[in-house]
Amino acid sequence: LGERNFPAGSIRLCASERSWGRVLAVNGTELTVEQATPRLLREVDIAFIAAGSDVSREMAPLAVEQGCVVVDKSSAFRMDPDVPLVVPEVNAGDISSHGGIIANPNCSTIQMVVALNPLHQVSPIKRIVVSTYQAVSGTGAAAIEELRQQTAQMMDGREADITPQTY
């Protein structure tokens, strides 16, 4: 936001309980991380949520109820037909159809559609097949712990307890 000179009268940082009270520098100003409460959200125009799907599913509707527009980085709303999935360089106009929440695709999708959009404008692309390999850390602490346990099991010569799932 600082690099783009985004017009912000004030910035509030909110996070999970483990980060409350932490002090972070934003645009040369030290800000204390706070708990996201309905009262705080009433004072906010735009809430950027980048804390995982569970947090987004809980906090985004609460923020919208308090009058915020939510830009969500998680996968929570990406497949919701009522929530625009926006890459500003490609479909910024879709922002106007939001009902309070604007979803953001995952990082590999963003760079792919930014690169493909000019080609699509000249010759419409009908289908793309893509495989990506994502870091487990992007899924959160529970997934990192699961990978640690599976690695330990395999290093001990045991079969790893693996439950396939989509993150």
Please place each PLM-identified region on the residue numbering.
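N-terminal Rossmann-like NAD(P) cofactor-binding subdomain of oxidoreductases
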Residues: L1-Y167
